[in-house]
Structure formats: C-alpha cells, structure tokens
Amino acid sequence: MYRVDILIPTARFVFSVEDGRTHVLPEFRSPEAFVTYRRLRDEQPVVGMTTFPNTVLLRGERTIVVDPGLPLQNEPVVRALATRGLDPGDVDLIVLTHAHLDHAGACADLMAPVAVHELETRSPSWIIVGGLLELLSLQRLAGDEGELAPGVAWVRTPGHCDGHISLRVDTTEGPVVLCGDTIGPGRAEFDAMRPSGPAAAELLGSWQRIRAWGPAKVIAGHLAPFAP
C-alpha cells in the first residue's frame, strides 16, 4: 500500500498590466482563477497567467514524485521533500502524466529516472521539455496500460493530449487516481460525464476508465482532491 501526499498544491496566478504596473489578482484557487483569467482577457489589454499543478508524492515500495511542475518549482519541490525527511536522492522515479511544461519542467534537481508515455516524446511539447528530460534516464511507457510498481498502475487517458496517462494508486483508504489534466479546468463536465470540445469522445472514454477504477479519491492536475 502507498501513502499519497501533495507536495505542492495547485494554484493559478492571474495578473494584468495597467499604467505600466503589474497587478496580481488575489484569487489563486485554480478553477476560479481560470474563469477570472478568461473574463479578463475580454476586458483588459494585457493579461497573463501562470499555473502550478498538484505535485504528488507516493511512498510505498518505491518513492515516486508525480508532475514536479514548472522549472521555477525545482527548489520548492526539494524543500517540500525535506519537510518529509527526504532528499532528492531518495526519489526512485518521476512520473509525468504528460509532457507539458507546467507539469514536466522541474525534474532537474531530482535527477531520478522519468517515466513518460512514448507518444509524448513525439508531441510538439517535447520540443520545449525534451532537451532536459533526455539528459535524465527516460522510461518510455508504451501501449495503453501497465504497472510502475506493485500497487501503482497506469492507463493511457487521452483527450488533453494523446500520450496523457493517469495513475491508480492502492492505499489503505482505497484507490487514489492521479489524472493530471484529463479532468479540468473545472469539475462540472466530469461530474455530468458530458465533455465538450474537439476531443470530447476521447475524454469521455478516459473519464469512463477513471470511474471504472472506483476511486476513493481523485487528484487532478489543477483541482483540489475530490471523491467522485
């Protein structure tokens, strides 16, 4: 059985530039801040956003970090590990739900092997993150499902991107699913099982896989953990 902890919780920081000054909005909860960002794009000439995912620590037979985050999160992740009595060298594996920069950019200070689906290594996002990741030891996942360790399974959950994966982690409280950006930026469509957009059919299939696991808890990339 594994213990699941969030090392760095998700947050979004939205800012606007007015009269030569940067104004950071106080709202940082991920879904609400995303809605604010989209609204402000129609109201303000210069608006920006940066976002951190949930960075998750799995402790059991192996010590695994899932989605370390943006490059600027290298030091915070190391410090968060230290508060739990861990050094970077204690990490056996980094797992990327997908290879977008906000999930895959903070691997350097951990220096552990990186597991990512092989489809992501052929995606446009690999142009941005691949140079760093290929300096590390890559574990290229292939196919539609597999096991990273006893008690940690993965399944391909396309929709957000083709090589996206989700994890099912066995814990004493029941299965915990880490699904990256397969769900989000909000929960409403997942709760109703009615995805929208050009990848709706793929997302619905991915959501059905997640529900079929019967999770006690779901941790998405940019949402607070929830029980489905």
Put a short name on every predicted segment.
Residues 1-61, 206-209, 214:
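Zn-dependent metallo-beta-lactamase
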Residues 3-9, 56-59, 144-172:
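Core dinuclear metal-dependent hydrolase active-site scaffold
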Residues 9-11, 63, 68-71, 99, ...:
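Active-site metal-binding loops of divalent metal-dependent hydrolases
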Residues 25, 32-52, 118-145, 186-193:
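Active-site-proximal loop/helix segment associated with metal-binding centers of metalloenzymes
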Residues 74-116:
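Active-site metal-binding motif and surrounding structural segment of the metallo-beta-lactamase
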Residues 79, 86, 92, 115-156, 162-228, ...:
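Metallo-beta-lactamase
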Residues 104-111, 123-127, 227:
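Short loop/helix-cap segments at secondary-structure boundaries that form the rim of catalytic
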